[in-house]
Amino acid sequence: MKSRLDQFRATRNALLGLMMCASPAWAQTPAPAPLELRLADVGRFAVFVDMGAVQRTGSVVKLRVLQVAEGGFTAGAEAFWGGWRHEVIDCQARTIAHAGFASIRAGGREGPLTGDQRPAAPLSAGSADDAVAKVVCDAWRPYAKVPVATSVEAAVKIGRPLIETGAEP
């Protein structure tokens, strides 16, 4: 027996199929691009520049820097790998403005970005900030034998032993 609504069945099925294909539940998000974390300095922290996040506008560079803390670093009762520092560097004026920090707990969970952009200040010669500026402004490549890390976890595995030994470029 035929229903009066049979004439709409094909259209309904086509619309349902289209809605399912366009649904966010069915959409596949592309895998995030691997990081390119280049070691810039080793001191109290191992400092890596995220080369994929470098944004240039004239002589001004916006970037983020991964600070890897020494093994066993805790704040309160939680273990931390380190954190992301967000920076604005003026390569011509040789100044840096800190623009926030996001912690990274052991295991890789990132905290929110906190802090506002501070006024620009001159780079201190020989500091970690100076090393970062040399990497992004002058194409300096210290630690040439140290591999570029493609994840935060890899940077932690590379950086922590270097902090212990006090590696030099």
Language-model-detected regions and their locations in the chain:
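Detector for methionine-enriched segments
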Residues: 1, 19-20, 51
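Bacterial N-terminal signal peptides
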Residues: 13-23
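Bacterial N-terminal signal peptides that target proteins for export
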Residues: 2-15
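N-terminal secretory-pathway/extracellular module detecting exported/lumenal segments
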Residues: 25-169
